[in-house]
């Protein structure tokens, strides 16, 4: 018969463990061995460092990104949210630890029959503790820790996005400056052409149509100059915002004039690893994962709310009718109590609360799976863009050189009276257009590499 209480104890513990098991679905991620469009890339482990943008070898870009990281307000907000989550963890834990309070009271009662005033003085410290028997503390702590990790990865995401935006804006700025330089150079050459045609016209060697055509070419190039000047100013203002600077402060810093965007361009070698790497590298995927962990903890708390709770309370102090006797031994009192509370009927509120928490968990599970698919798509898109742009750049480099030779030879033929001026116009337009397109392709290829680094998760662990 003595074994019966022991057996009942084992059964009770087993039921407690079973009742706390929340049985949640696991993510189903479709893994692939390699990227579909990554055949021309190294499949070694990803080795992008924390300062991944340094691979471009541009000191101005390095300085801009470092300044943005140090001053950008969104970075500061994200860092503050990490600290907020850390404080919330302490608050969460404290809710499941004993609480101690103290009370001091003075009472007076007047008896009208005897006309006496009875006084009482009390000092009663109290302690109470709701025992987390069914995992409520564990689930609450798990949820709070997941919130910290979520904010850490959110910080990583904000930082990576900032780094990529600064790099993209910088190469866009270089592109506009190159376009402006081409427009100015073309305008100068066309102005010289107008001077020549005007001279030939005055001596009867060129028609008025030729002169008007030469002027139209000049006006076309000159019309592009203010457009690129405007684009440069707008890009600089965008960079100022990313830097956390006022426009005036940022403009005083200055960004060196550079044509390195074409002169120093070369294909960059980036190891892309395997698709599963994005699961632990991408900030958005990891943030979605920890959101899922928070949801799981919320389900656990909702389940715990449906189970019995045990509260222990203790109070001890002094109660007396005379203030000078407050600290005498005769006035000391103590009380200890334990209570067990089991929710019985609340119109299904607790059960529906758990079911609602489970639905939120499923929503976040699907969001996590979707974030993985989107990460794969981002990498594949960047790989396609880089691969196709490589071939396009090679063709356009040859095309620009061909149009340059055509323009030189056509102009020489025209001066010798062996070609019509329309041929000169066509050659000039083709050269101008091909130069612009080539500069844009080079800038876009830099941005493609930026997008690939961002898609792979950038420099994890900052």
Describe the function of each predicted region:
Residues 45, 59, 88, 112, ...:
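Coil residues (strongly favoring Ser/Thr
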Residues 146, 153-274, 385, 412, ...:
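Periplasmic alpha-helical coiled-coil/stalk elements that build and connect Gram-negative outer-membrane
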